[in-house]
Amino acid sequence: MTDNKDDKTLSVAGKKTLTLKPSGVTQGTVRQDMGRGRTKAVVVETKRTRGPLKHKDERPITPVAATPAARPAEQRPMPPQPSGRPAPQPQPHQPRQEQNRPRGGVVLNDLSAGEMEARRRALAEAQIRDAEEAKRRAEDEVRRRREEEERLAREKEEAARRAAEEAARPPVEAEKTEEKVEAASPAVGERRAETRPQPGRAAPAATPAAPDGAALRGRRGTESEEDERRRSGAGAPRGKVVRPEPAKPAPRAKGDEGRRQGKLTLTTAAVDEDGSQRGRSLSAMRRRQEKFKRSQMQETREKISREVVLPETITIQELSQRMSERAVDVIKFLMKEGQMMKPGDLIDADLAELIAGEFGHTVKRVSESDVEEGIFNISDVDDDMQSRPPIVTIMGHVDHGKTSLLDAIRHANVVAGEAGGITQHIGAYQVEQNGQKITFIDTPGHAAFTAMRARGAQATDIAVLVVAADDSVMPQTIESINHAKAAGVPIIVAINKIDKPSANPQKVRTELLQHEVFVESMGGEVLDVEVSAKNQTNLDKLLEAILLQSEILDLKANPNRTAEGTVVEAELDRGRGAVATVLVQKGTLTPGQIIVAGDQWGRVRALVNDKGEHVKAAGPSTPVEVLGLSGTPAAGDRFAVVESESRAREISEYRQRLAREKAVARQSGSRGSLEQMMTQLQTSGVKEFPLVIKGDVQGSIEAISGALDKLGTDEVRARIVHSGAGGITESDVSLAEASNAAIIGFNVRANKQARDASERAGIEIRYYNIIYDLVDDVKAAMSGLLSPERRETFLGNAEILEVFNITKVGKVAGCRVTEGKVERGVGVRLVRDNVVIHEGKLKTLKRFKDEVSEVQSGQECGMAFENYEDIRAGDTIECFRVEHVTRTL
């Protein structure tokens, strides 16, 4: 405490605080560097440690004050000695901050043995790190030299290759190139010589880069020593915050442009070091030569003709790309033809073909329908063909016994399952006779199912025409004959009901001659068999005739290929989904295959035959029910197996888009020409009877739609808002409510939600199972929409003899009835000079001042009109009665 003892006397006048300094503590002040030239005085207290006494052999180590980093920038270093590359020893340069820093008041203590040992270890570790750093720098130097040598070798090889190319050029071009290369090569060589370091040689003393390198090495050495001292903490008092000095670059001497020597600027880029204009580089010369060669080759290049694939519509830009021509050239050609178009404009295939032909290319036309190529009509090899069962269609007039005949053949009773005893579906069945199978298709006979008969004839090999012996040839019989002839299938005539007393088979044969059906007994080639379905008479003869005809036709198919056939019927079954009855005509259909039927597709989940049994495969001429389609296809659509779901989806989407476009075309087809506009004006006053029709199968819905279309007249017609196969749902009721339509269910029922919704909305749902009843009821309902017919009945004429003006009554005409009679309250017309002046009713009819109901011919009477008094003598009054009669379709 004696060192810091103050001799001043204590007083209360000063601002100092009375404190008691602890013993064993020394105080001092140091200047702390705050950065950017700012300093701060800091009070430092050092506490002495009372440790054990030192041994005699242990020498005290006086701590050395921290030496500031040396800066070798004030004087230029000496050039290196040729014997080695030692770093020059620069003069230590004291920073300004260290010079201005006060040294007074710093007290340093002795270091303990542990601290000295820690500092020795830190110094040894720093030396090891410095050795490793020096070794790494040496390895980097060796690697850089190796890379430089490799680069020089590559440049030599490139120069040799270039020289060989120059030697191979024609003499004239080589001379021109040499002149340009000579003009450019000196500058290039000088620049390369300046910028490329020479490995393995010591830099001369006059080179300015060497002193810089020496200074850099000296600076690195000084910085490493300073870092070592900073890490060891030598010379720094304990507790002092030491801020590391930022490494400052060595100052360069004036006129030292080493850093800016290789910098490329806009000014120096085009001028060499000697001030001359820079010439072209070798790369530029080489590019020019290649461009010249290309231009020479283009002059002699021949036109390449390509095959251009053209869709139905294409843009000009895409067409030019497919032809490998410029779009500008195509537009120029179109401008010459008088068409101003842009590259993004669409053109049709005809114009695109004309453009491609003008440019010398061939054309291959494609369309969207090409997605269906390769599905149907695939040719088979004759060696793979095998015999198949015949497909026989039973056709004829209604109630002539077609289904009963088929029942007798199948030993089943199908008629009992049909409502009203008439066939309303196409039934496909398979029977076996003498070990050979025959596939039968039963078609409806009445007029509503014309499309079904046509479909059955298209998918058949033989048509069996059933004619009742007691009823002879009827309208649907003639229609069936026409369908069979149109399909080009042979006909076998089955004269049914020969067991009836009124049967006359010979009359049937004679009437068939009128329709060009010549049976064998009449000298023709058509087979005829007299059968009785009721008594099962001559059924075996009918089957033998069918097998005989099939042998003549020699029916064959390839079962070892993808399946192909026709959709006979389709329905939406509750629990099974969409069910399609198909007839396989080629190949074999198995579960798991992907099929496309019309605009629907799906994977076959199950195959069910006509007996309700699940089968694993369906060969040619086999009728089966297919489960797994996405929707119900239309009856008569063809189906085929495809290889993948993507192909099936693509075909299905194309067909659905085609159907939508056709529907839109039908709706918008009424606009256009004047005749179409007149037709639209005529049909604009037609009353419509909206209907929502749900049926059990697609074919029945088609038959109902066709029958209702025939009911339409010029005044009223049926409009089917929606139709589909399946039960009546709540959405159908909502649609009917929105369109104010009636709901008709044919062999289907509505679910509970649909019934509740119909009761709330007041929509009537009618159920039918016989198509005749459905058509009759719709016909009666449509008749109610017809405006009643106005019928006018002539009663008589009266001639006005005199006109009287009576008070409170007005003008009264004194008349004589010249024809018929005149009644009060009927319609009258006032005719003057054969022109109708007024039409109204009689207000009063009097004879001799008495009101009478009628006046006969030859009698006189007085008549007055309601709200009309312009009557004159000589006018004629015509009396008539109007009646409104209800019309029917």
From Swiss-Prot:
Its main location: cytoplasm. Residues 421-425 are annotated as: G2. Residues 77-93 have a biased composition (Pro residues). Residues 116-182, 220-231 have a biased composition (Basic and acidic residues). Residues 396-403 are annotated as: G1. InterPro entries: EF-G-like_DII (IPR053905), EFTu-like_2 (IPR004161), IF2_assoc_dom_bac (IPR013575), IF2_II (IPR044145), IF2_N (IPR006847), P-loop_NTPase (IPR027417), Small_GTP-bd (IPR005225), T_Tr_GTP-bd_dom (IPR000795). One of its GO terms (molecular function) is GTPase activity. PANTHER family: TR-TYPE G DOMAIN-CONTAINING PROTEIN, TRANSLATION INITIATION FACTOR IF-2-RELATED. This is Translation initiation factor IF-2. The gene is infB.
